[in-house]
């Protein structure tokens, strides 16, 4: 394929896939949905013509593009089945380090109000256990990974596959000293699950616990999990020596200040190792976006900077809260931030990834110094 002297202006991801009308004039093409086959077809056309030939783009499924000022959206791209047909990522093109990441599935069986995963992927699909372990081995043997995080929405969604992955990992000598991190849900964390995670060398689990208030939790997660489940998940993980990390969402439309403080209390008393808290943002493709659109808070042609809850301009970011003013929300965010810092300071020294994080940071600094020295020598 010929090399382009300038970047090819192409976009993709959940936002433009859910709202193709937001494709900006400075982008030639948007890849909608699953992108591997689509981007290959785009590049094959580019290799022939040296540019994205507008008269040929209509034959490529799963894209949006503008022609003479008009937006064209082609037929939806069919999902790749099975996912094992996808080659391993060419990680040599990336800045690899001792910290690697992997996706072993696409999609999520749940439908949280603030998350677009279910709508974007439409259904839950898995790479086979054998494929996943083969990719893990390549990451270790070829790229030197020592800590690997599963970035799936819910890696343990299929219990049998999850247990098979754990079993295969234990049979591979090259993976014997590798530590893993995964994402999970509180209602799926049982003693048996934690035992399997421990045997699989998982020492860090991230969970979207979202709230310490029952009513808010039902709004965000549809009643599939309780505050008691959240507490129990942390206790079970700690019982097996696994770090419990969590994220929370505050600022739901009908959430009161007292209910937000319930979440702060949970964070302070649950024993979590690391915490992130976010203000609810109506991202495209989510039920929250649909609600925000119904009340006129957002639109397809809005100023997208308004979705930045940390925008410095007072009153500029969109807030959906009916009971907490932007100024009050800002003060509450400071409380959560201070709680996060306190937990992080307490946990950092004992976090399973901390030694490797220090080594990776030092190696990164050393590499930067070497590059600067080489540039100066030239």
Please give the residue ranges for each predicted region.
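Glycine-rich beta-alpha loop elements in corrinoid/cobalamin-binding modules
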Residues: 1-79, 279-281, 285
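C-terminal accessory regions of radical SAM enzymes
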Residues: 64, 243, 258-378
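Conserved strand-turn element in the central/C-terminal portion of the radical SAM core barrel
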Residues: 183-187, 212-217, 221, 234-259, ...
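Short, well-ordered beta-strand core segments
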Residues: 30-31, 205, 275
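Radical SAM [4Fe-4S] cluster-binding motif and immediate context
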Residues: 84-245, 265
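Catalytic cores of alpha/beta
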Residues: 20-25, 193, 254-268
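A structural micro-motif
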Residues: 7, 28, 69, 176-178, ...
């Amino acid at each position: 394929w010929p090399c382009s002297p300038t970047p090819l202006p192409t976009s993709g991801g959940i936002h433009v896939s859910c709202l193709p009308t937001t494709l900006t004039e400075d982008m030639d093409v948007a890849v909608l949905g699953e992108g591997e086959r689509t981007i290959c077809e785009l590049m094959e056309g580019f290799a022939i013509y040296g540019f994205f030939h507008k008269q040929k783009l209509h034959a490529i499924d799963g894209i949006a593009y503008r022609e003479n000022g008009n937006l064209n959206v082609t037929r939806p791209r069919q999902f790749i089945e099975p996912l094992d047909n996808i080659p391993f990522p060419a990680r040599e093109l990336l800045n690899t380090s001792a910290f690697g990441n992997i996706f072993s599935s696409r999609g999520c069986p749940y439908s949280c109000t603030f998350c677009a995963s279910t709508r974007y992927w439409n259904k839950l699909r898995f790479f086979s256990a054998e494929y996943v372990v083969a990719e893990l081995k390549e990451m270790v043997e070829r790229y030197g990974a020592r800590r690997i995080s599963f970035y799936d929405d819910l890696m343990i969604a299929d219990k049998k596959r999850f247990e098979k992955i754990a079993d295969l990992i234990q049979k591979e000598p090259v993976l014997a000293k590798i530590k893993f991190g995964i994402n999970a849900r509180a209602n799926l964390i049982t003693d048996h699950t934690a035992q399997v995670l421990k045997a699989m060398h998982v020492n860090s689990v991230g969970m979207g616990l979202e709230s310490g208030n029952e009513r808010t939790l039902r709004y965000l997660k549809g009643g599939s999990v309780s505050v008691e489940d959240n507490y129990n998940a942390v206790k079970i993980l700690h019982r097996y020596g696994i770090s419990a990390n969590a994220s929370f969402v505050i600022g739901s439309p009908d959430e009161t200040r007292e209910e937000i403080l319930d979440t702060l209390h949970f964070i302070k008393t649950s024993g979590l190792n690391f915490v992130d808290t976010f203000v609810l943002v109506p991202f495209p493709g989510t039920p929250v976006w649909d609600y925000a659109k119904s009340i006129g808070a957002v639109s397809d042609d809005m100023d997208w900077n308004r979705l930045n809850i940390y925008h410095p301009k007072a009153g500029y970011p969109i807030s959906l809260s009916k009971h907490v003013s932007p100024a009050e929300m800002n003060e509450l965010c400071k409380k959560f931030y201070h709680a996060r810092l306190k937990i992080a300071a307490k946990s950092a020294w004992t976090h399973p990834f901390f030694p490797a994080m220090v080594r990776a940071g030092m190696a990164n600094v050393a590499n930067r110094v070497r590059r600067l020295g080489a540039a100066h020598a030239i």
